Amino acid sequence: MCSSDLPANALPDAGQRSLIGMAPAFAAACHRLRRVAPTRATVLFVGESGVGKELFARMLHDIGPNPRGPFVSVNCAAIPDTLVESELFGVERGAFTSATQSREGRFERADGGTLFLDEISSLTMVAQGKLLRALQEGEIERVGGTTTIKVDVRVVAASNVDLRDEVKAGRFREDLFFRLNVFPNHIPALRDRRDDIPL
């Protein structure tokens, strides 16, 4: 059981998001989660759709250094390409026709906490470049803005495809891949966790 050795009294909401499983592959994923949680390292969860990558990301946040900070989740595949930059980095008033007021992006909303970027392989190359800058410099710039904004955010990403293949195909930046792949964690599918099926 992944949650058996976690001090629940120190984890807000941790009991509601316990990760339970006995299969060796699942136990290994939980072990890697506990090992990286106290650090500020960027984590990349890899696994098929439906294996619980967001649940792992939330548990990582709950047992990490800033559990009381915000946890902001973004499904990158669900955001139209034309809006992804303004959603992630915010927008200044007048940046485009419908921008009638300035608005924070997900990075600013996650300041002091965790930003979970699901289906990260779907980001445009332009958005990937801005994300790389945010990871390297700890700052962002809103769409239509000229001022840099410092953000203190732990970025956690997830993908259901092998990003190495995306890099080879020219669809994903190699430098961003290396920034995200600091601590990869593969989440096994249920068919690979036969010991857990009776649970």
Predicted features and spans:
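Short, well-ordered beta-strand elements within core beta-sheets of diverse protein domains
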Residues: 184-192
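Conserved small/polar residues in nucleotide/adenosyl-binding loops
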Residues: 1-6
